[in-house]
């Protein structure tokens, strides 16, 4: 799914982002004609349904061979916060696009729950923007299964908004793993992985300090989601996820951050994918914590201290022998100029793995 604008503003960057969106369509056509993109096309508040459907950009998207089409020929179509426009508005868009030769199947992306029944009359699929903090249940699939043909489930790593000094705490990798687990257990039809590459919400962009760790984790859970079978772990991998400072760190400038109603979670996590049992260790300054882990996936968390500057160290041992070890690429600071609560992440692999024919 890629964002576009039906009527991009001439000065606020929407045209610039649109160039990249169309470049993705062109790349998909050139590199893999079987790879299709679901266009999510924004509208301004005052744009009429007819002007939206007749937009030069909408027509370009509709004519592109990389745009996702259903077996019945309809073009899959979406927009973030679909409910910001009325059902009647969307009916007129659908009628106009059909008259223009491009019937669409609307996949609603919702930020709320109260209009789902109304939109069930016109939506081929439904997905929610989702939760950004882990919980016990997110009944999206159960709620929307009777209302639509396809149910999409949201997948996100974290939500850190520098522009408002506001963050929802994902508790290291917990939100990402929890959302994937629920999508699998609830048998969602689609998974919507929100990368947010406009750098405004820091969800999963690989050029940030989280690196490619979320993509490694997503690759594992995508296979599980698509096949219905948990993938076998055939090599040891350690992933560390932590913030660069405590939420209550001494800051020299700026205002404090708002962590929402759940509050901050100050922990260092070592997430292990193990082929067999082992001992996990986390070293913080002069103190070492350890946990016995079984084969499979183990999350090991320890408190992130508030007034200590250090570089976290991580290791996996078996029978007293170090299998994998390494330091975080990101030091933890005891004071900062401006705080940055976005999580950092990295991967550690056994040093001798390549000699074993990996």
What do these predicted regions represent?
Residues 1-269, 275-358:
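Glycan-processing catalytic domains of CAZymes
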